[in-house]
Amino acid sequence: HEIEERAEWIRYGEKWDNIVETNDYVKQYPNINVHYSPVMSIFNFHRLPEMFLYWQDKGWIDKHFNIILPAEPGFGTNADFKFLPYEFKLQTKEKLEKFMKDEVLVVRNQPLANTISSLITSMIDYNDNSKTIRFKLPNDSTESTSLRVTRSLEQVSWDINLHDKVRKAQFSDIFPELNFLKTTK
């Protein structure tokens, strides 16, 4: 499954089966409240709706597992979602706002909506000093767009290319919509 492959790539060395086993074990005890706090990054912020629906389909989000508060990456993290291209940020914003408006989750709490709104604002408003390159977004085959490349994105690109050399899984196969991150030099 796509969610599983992505999670194993992001948390290299972690086996998805261990995550499933732990969540299924804890799910047996209705007296336990589980808090999910996924750290948002370049690799997963745009996929938040799919992640939440996957967790809900697995039974990990229900009336007992109902506290979800996505977290920003720590200061100095190279893979901060704020470094995404502006056009990609706008697509992500639209997707997340629609997801929250449609209320497809059994979890309908204001803290989750406020947190996602705050993360979107933080992402859109972020500005820095950087150079610009041109590339095509995956959903737009005709027009190129620009990517403001920071040292952090250069490091992400370097890391991705290194991981592709040593891992069995290739970044482009797992994150095709983010393949532009491999070419930010």
PLM segments and residue spans:
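Radical SAM enzyme [4Fe-4S]-AdoMet core and its adjacent flexible, acidic
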Residues: H1-K185
